[in-house]
Amino acid sequence: MDGLTLKRTPDAIKWIQDSLAESNIDYVLKHGTYTTQIQHSMGTIKLMLNNFQNRVFCASQMVKKDCKNSVNGQEIMKATHYKKNYDANPKIESIKYDTCLNIDLSSAYAYCLFNSGLITKKTFNYLLKLPKMERLTSVGMLATSHVKYFYSGGKCVDFQPYREPTAQIFFYLIDEINYLMQDIKWMLGNDFIFYWVDGVFMKPTTPKSKIEKVENLLISLGYKYKYEKVENFSVNRIQDKVIIDMIKNDESKRYEFSTGASGRELGKHIAKKAMQDLQN
């Protein structure tokens, strides 16, 4: 079974484990976000969730190298960052609109990396050339994790978890984009409906002056954006749970999330604003 590369499924992993146990062969099972490797005395078997192009791994290595070599990257890796990336207007209980305004950031994480001085222009341009999902995957590999399970006599005798040292940089990206979305939320006031990751949704009656403020903010921070077509938009709230349905770019979408206590998020936003004022 040396040198095999298979599609990662529970059945495939079980078959290999059973075969090794029956043959009384000790092995190490390394299970990660995208791949599972089974290393034994006769070689290694690799099981892949997706068959990524080499350019994805190349981009990932370029990003990691740049981040590790940057002064800002070293500081970010020492800190802890929040991972929340959504929010909704607490005053909205239930609404329906034939159409809705939606601004999406273009290549948000790539621009955040570059704007934060974490990657070089060369790496930034390489990322922008990748298709969207490949770009997201290559940046997401900053937070790659795996667990090694050590098997002897067909039973697990030990395990070792591992997380990439650059993981906090990925969480920093989430945090920074979330902070930007919070800024936009405050700008829009009652016209804000909700945001999800790097896309913000607002009422179709939002004044042009508010929209221009949002656009000017994004431009000033070095982000590109686009407007997406949104129809049949509805929001329903059940206590802390928000359910949002829409047709976006002719595709049906649903978002569900909880809007529980967000005091920590609000406090962080206020503190960051205050620090910016003090520094200026």
Predicted feature locations:
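Conserved acidic
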Residues: 1-280
